[in-house]
Amino acid sequence: MPATVKKTGSKKSKRNVPNGVVHIQSTFNNTIVSITDTSGHVISWSSAGASGFKGARKGTPFAAQTAAEAAARRALDQGMRQIEVLVRGPGAGRETAIRALQVAGLEITLIRDVTPLPHNGCRRPKRRRV
């Protein structure tokens, strides 16, 4: 009986994807950056929590910058050069994440705010009294 060869390492091959879309979801508690190709397949992602921040520090602009840099680094390894940025949510890390993508060497062709706005849908949660 032949010995089975165990494969180690990443299964993802290095693809050459020149254009892509960056989805930045920025809430008050966290910032998630997903980089996809034009058809929507995720190439790289990162979040403030995945970058090593915990608790309230995940909602800071610096955590969003770190997450965007990490995702951009992996996208650049795949050969990405031009991106469109779709920003969702009201969080503190929106602008900082976009700036970090620019500094990382990605050329931004479009910035669009895709925050969902209800046309009077569900009832809002009651106001916090602190």
Curated annotation (Swiss-Prot):
Keywords: Ribonucleoprotein, Ribosomal protein, RNA-binding, rRNA-binding. Signal peptide: none annotated. Pfam families: Ribosomal_S11 (PF00411). GO terms for molecular function: rRNA binding; structural constituent of ribosome. InterPro entries: Ribosomal_uS11, Ribosomal_uS11_bac-type, Ribosomal_uS11_CS, Ribosomal_uS11_sf. GO terms for cellular component: ribonucleoprotein complex; ribosome. It comes from the Bacteria. SUPFAM superfamilies: Translational machinery components. The keyword Ribosomal protein applies. GO terms for biological process: translation. Part of the 30S ribosomal subunit. Interacts with proteins S7 and S18. Binds to IF-3. Located on the platform of the 30S subunit, it bridges several disparate RNA helices of the 16S rRNA. Forms part of the Shine-Dalgarno cleft in the 70S ribosome. Belongs to the universal ribosomal protein uS11 family. This is Small ribosomal subunit protein uS11. It comes from Prochlorococcus marinus (strain MIT 9301). The gene is rpsK.
